[in-house]
Amino acid sequence: MALKLRRNDSVVILTGKDKGKTGIIKNILSLNQVIVKGLNLIKKHQKPVPSQNKSGGIIEKEAPIHISNIAILNPESNKADRIGFRFEEGRKVRFFKSTGKTIQ
């Protein structure tokens, strides 16, 4: 199955502690997970590494989210939407299912 979401797509979180918030896909991981910029933050306890001059402490970083828990954001309606594929001029393009407009 082709992955319908791509890097730098605007998405909305459907479930979890950040439900309803919007963000941009920063990275796509294996196992159908993505990292959304600034959302699903976790606190990681970092040990100090004196040999590399790294100080320890608590850092915040983005955790992966499964693709079933996010949806692409349609900029016209400002709501979550579904994605479809079609061929235009010999190229496979993505489009919004609700409006039929192609995704840039």
UniProtKB/Swiss-Prot annotation:
Belongs to the universal ribosomal protein uL24 family. One of two assembly initiator proteins, it binds directly to the 5'-end of the 23S rRNA, where it nucleates assembly of the 50S subunit. One of the proteins that surrounds the polypeptide exit tunnel on the outside of the subunit. Disulfide bonds: none annotated. This is Large ribosomal subunit protein uL24. Part of the 50S ribosomal subunit. The gene is rplX. InterPro entries: KOW, Rib_uL2_dom2, Ribosomal_uL24, Ribosomal_uL24_CS, Ribosomal_uL24_KOW, Translation_prot_SH3-like_sf. One of its GO terms (molecular function) is structural constituent of ribosome.
